């Protein structure tokens, strides 16, 4: 079946069952096919393909109202030429496309949206803005692929997903973007690779796309998210741009790419993450779901609107630049207090950041949260200390809350009153190095 082959054309198929061996939509022209009202389109040969937008063409396929496509070897959306444009829309409960492989943006521009309960399934792999080696390469062509999965019961399934890159030297640049929002679901039972090779850009968005307003999150079910390719020209970004108060990512994140918390929601990480790129928290909260889930290989930058929340789980970071909030423990009155330690292997810098801690306010031996800096400290930090059930007591040296191994030039000052019983506590520097809580009983009137 060919629609839009060298001349423009369109086709509407309503409530039919049909079987074909292949389809081309928009080859050197504009073409579109719309399936509605539970149409069932079956492909019957091992090499069956659908091409959407090839050469200089523009091809669009709408799969709507419970319609289904199955039996495909491949579905190829935007392929073989820089001006090729392909669009696939799967919309509506039970609307689905199933193929052995799905290729979106291979030397062309491909866009896919899966919404309102639709499903796209690739049985082997899904390439988004990724150029595979094949016989139809055109030299120095760019590739752009974008997939949106949105709304409840909307699902993308693939063993693994590749975003932005190539395994051949005959392309100039590639971009692959995958966004999941508003209860959409991505299932990749092996991994998602974000930014595969040099000159490749890969972006995985939970919630809104980068630069757009935050959206309710979707979910990602994959054991591994790999950020980054083989050299510095690869761009790999994982964006948490959502509004959910309870989004949890269980995947482990590795590679060289960047992690951004940019939405107003709370993202809880619970994988054993080891990525080496920077972590930016500009808005909302990045929260720990277990001990050592924050990557110890990453530089953390917390802006004034962001919160790095250890949530009662001790963590180790490479460096920390704090202009926002770092919250250590999560104590509840009447419960036993377990202290939390934030260890910085490198330097700690602050720009009026807020460090929130809990301490059983008593004598020098009191149990407390602690900040340990192996490198140097600089800048100003406000310290809010909440009492975890202490009754107050005299201190001699004090309760150590900040330990500095390197050059101790940072200033830590008390934020609000720190009180237990008749005692007031102050944040003071001792031995020109570390910071302590020291107690006093204020003089009477």
Name each region found by the language model.
Residues 81-84, 133-142, 167-173, 198-200, ...:
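Short, solvent-exposed loop/turn segments that connect beta-strands within catalytic domains
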Residues 28, 38, 55, 66, ...:
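Generic structural motif
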Residues 1-5, 24-26, 48-55, 76-81, ...:
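Extracellular glycan-interaction patches encoded by glycine-rich segments
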Residues 7-9, 16, 21-23, 29-33, ...:
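The right-handed parallel beta-helix/beta-solenoid scaffold, focusing on the short coil/turn
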Residues 205-207, 213-220, 233-234, 241-242, ...:
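Extracellular beta-solenoid/beta-roll
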């Amino acid at each position: 079946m060919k629609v839009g082959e060298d001349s423009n054309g369109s086709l509407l198929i309503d409530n039919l069952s049909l079987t074909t061996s292949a389809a081309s939509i928009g080859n050197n022209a504009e073409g579109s096919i719309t399936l509605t009202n539970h149409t069932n389109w079956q492909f019957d040969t091992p090499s069956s393909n659908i091409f959407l937008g090839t050469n200089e063409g523009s091809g669009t396929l709408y799969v709507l109202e419970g319609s289904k496509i199955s039996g495909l070897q491949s579905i190829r959306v935007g392929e073989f030429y820089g001006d090729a444009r392909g669009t696939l829309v799967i919309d509506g409960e039970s609307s689905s496309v199933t193929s052995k492989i799905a290729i979106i943006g291979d030397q062309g521009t491909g866009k896919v949206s899966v919404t309102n309960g639709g499903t796209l399934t690739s049985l082997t792999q899904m390439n988004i803005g990724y150029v595979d080696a094949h016989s139809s390469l055109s030299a120095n062509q760019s590739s752009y692929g974008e997939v949106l999965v949105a709304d409840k019961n909307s699902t993308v399934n693939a063993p693994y997903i590749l975003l932005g890159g190539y395994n051949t030297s005959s392309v100039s640049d590639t971009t692959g973007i995958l966004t999941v929002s508003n209860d959409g679901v991505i299932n990749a039972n092996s991994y998602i690779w974000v930014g595969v090779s040099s000159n490749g850009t890969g972006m995985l968005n939970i919630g809104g796309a980068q630069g757009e307003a935050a959206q309710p999150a979707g979910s990602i079910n994959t054991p591994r998210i790999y950020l980054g390719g083989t050299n510095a020209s690869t761009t790999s970004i994982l964006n948490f741009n959502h509004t959910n108060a309870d989004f949890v990512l269980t995947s482990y994140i590795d590679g060289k790419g960047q992690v951004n918390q940019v939405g107003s929601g709370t993202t809880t990480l619970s994988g054993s993450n080891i990525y080496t790129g920077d972590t930016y928290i500009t808005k909302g909260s990045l929260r720990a779901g277990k001990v050592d889930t924050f990557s110890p290989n990453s530089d953390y930058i917390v802006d004034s609107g962001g919160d790095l929340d250890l949530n009662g789980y001790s963590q180790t970071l490479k460096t920390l630049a704090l202009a926002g909030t770092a919250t250590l423990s999560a104590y509840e009155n009447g419960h036993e207090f377990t202290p939390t330690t934030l260890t910085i292997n490198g330097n700690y810098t602050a720009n009026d950041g807020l460090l929130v801690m809990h301490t059983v306010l008593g004598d020098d031996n009191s149990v407390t949260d602690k900040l340990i800096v192996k490198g140097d400290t600089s800048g100003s930090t406000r310290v809010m200390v909440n009492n975890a059930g202490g009754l107050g007591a005299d201190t001699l040296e004090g309760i150590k809350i900040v330990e500095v191994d390197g050059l101790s030039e940072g200033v830590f000052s008390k934020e609000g009153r720190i009180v237990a019983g008749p005692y007031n506590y102050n944040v003071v520097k001792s031995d020109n190095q570390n910071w302590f809580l020291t107690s006093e009983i204020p003089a009477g009137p």
